[in-house]
């Protein structure tokens, strides 16, 4: 029987978009498996073997596979889940679908050496790909603009959103004041340093959740907080588990996402599920994902314009009907169905 392998080695990296992508899509692929389709197999770290049910097979990830990755003879297709992957089947006979999540490095101020490193990774992924998927039209446009894809088909398959859990776990420490919320990795392209200015003239806290990847940038955020004299109301709360994340989304006054470069921007949709005012940048994929349901910061992030927008948005009456219609475009079942269609065309 033919086997389709979905590479989930990125499950090694919790609190990341890649983790969420692999976990949610894997579960949806199992649910959407067509009758008489190929057998699903997941390439996973040891601790995730069996995670997606007994109907699938599991191949264990090993770090040495970056040098040599053997695959069973039954493998008819290998789906590489990220352009950053270092784990490629050693056999070149196997068709490969590669998901490219973003081309963010082209939108960031990086050293020539760092940019060249990223470009090599992307070029390797494109060379090995039989077909490419991006997770937004914005990412597709970037791929076609910055790389020679040599005639390969590029499809767009949107990510989905996780369903809101029935029971939300309160965090160990509950904020004392009403709060604005930002969830993301703490690094420069997330642009979080523009947010402390939004605390001027109100009694709100700013909670910043996520792993600190750039300690120097975290200090820059705190310097901005001191400049606006709101340092006592800017709180770094670190990475949050899924249940805690949903509690913060459910209880925040508004969700803020000023990122300069996103392949998709899933947190925007997660906040909309709770009908919260969402304020984000108008860069890369975010207008595509937020649509008419979010408020867009001034392109240059002028503090006065951002403050006025926040005040306006906090008082706005949001249309739940419009938000529900927008969210219905982004489900993991729809994503899995689209991937299965591509798989069957490739096998």
Regions found by a protein language model. Give the residues of each.
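Carbohydrate transferase catalytic cores enriched for Leloir-type hexosyltransferases
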Residues: 1-347
């Amino acid at each position: 029987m033919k086997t389709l392998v979905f590479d989930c080695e990125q499950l090694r990296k919790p609190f990341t978009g890649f983790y969420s992508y692999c976990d949610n899509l894997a579960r949806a692929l199992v649910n959407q498996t067509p009758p008489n389709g190929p057998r699903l197999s997941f390439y996973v770290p040891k601790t995730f073997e069996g995670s997606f049910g007994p109907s699938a097979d599991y191949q264990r990830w090993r770090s040495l596979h970056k040098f040599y990755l053997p695959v069973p003879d039954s493998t008819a297709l290998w789906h590489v889940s990220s352009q950053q992957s270092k784990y490629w089947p050693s056999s070149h006979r196997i068709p490969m679908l590669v998901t490219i999540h973003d081309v963010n490095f082209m939108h960031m101020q990086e050293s020539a050496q760092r940019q060249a490193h990223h470009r090599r990774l992307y070029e390797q992924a494109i060379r090995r790909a039989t077909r490419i998927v991006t997770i937004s039209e914005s990412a597709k446009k970037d791929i076609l603009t910055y790389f020679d894809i040599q005639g390969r088909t590029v499809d767009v398959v949107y990510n989905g959103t996780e369903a809101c859990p029935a029971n939300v776990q309160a965090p160990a420490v509950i904020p004392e004041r009403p709060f604005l919320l930002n969830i993301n990795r703490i690094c420069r392209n997330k642009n979080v340093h523009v947010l402390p200015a939004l605390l001027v003239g109100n009694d709100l806290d700013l909670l910043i959740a996520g792993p600190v990847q750039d300690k120097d940038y975290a200090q820059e955020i705190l310097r901005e907080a001191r400049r606006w004299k709101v340092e006592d109301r800017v709180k770094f709360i670190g990475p949050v588990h899924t249940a805690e994340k949903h509690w913060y989304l459910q209880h925040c006054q508004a969700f803020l996402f000023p990122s300069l470069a996103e392949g998709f921007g899933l947190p925007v949709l997660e906040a909309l599920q709770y009908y919260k005012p969402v304020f984000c940048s108008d860069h890369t994929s975010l207008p595509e994902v937020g649509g008419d349901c979010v408020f867009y910061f001034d392109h240059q992030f002028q503090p006065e314009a951002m403050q006025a927008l926040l005040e306006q948005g906090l008082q706005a009456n949001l249309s739940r009907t419009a938000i529900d219609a927008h969210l219905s475009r982004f489900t993991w079942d729809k994503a899995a169905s689209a991937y299965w269609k591509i798989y069957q065309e490739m096998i």
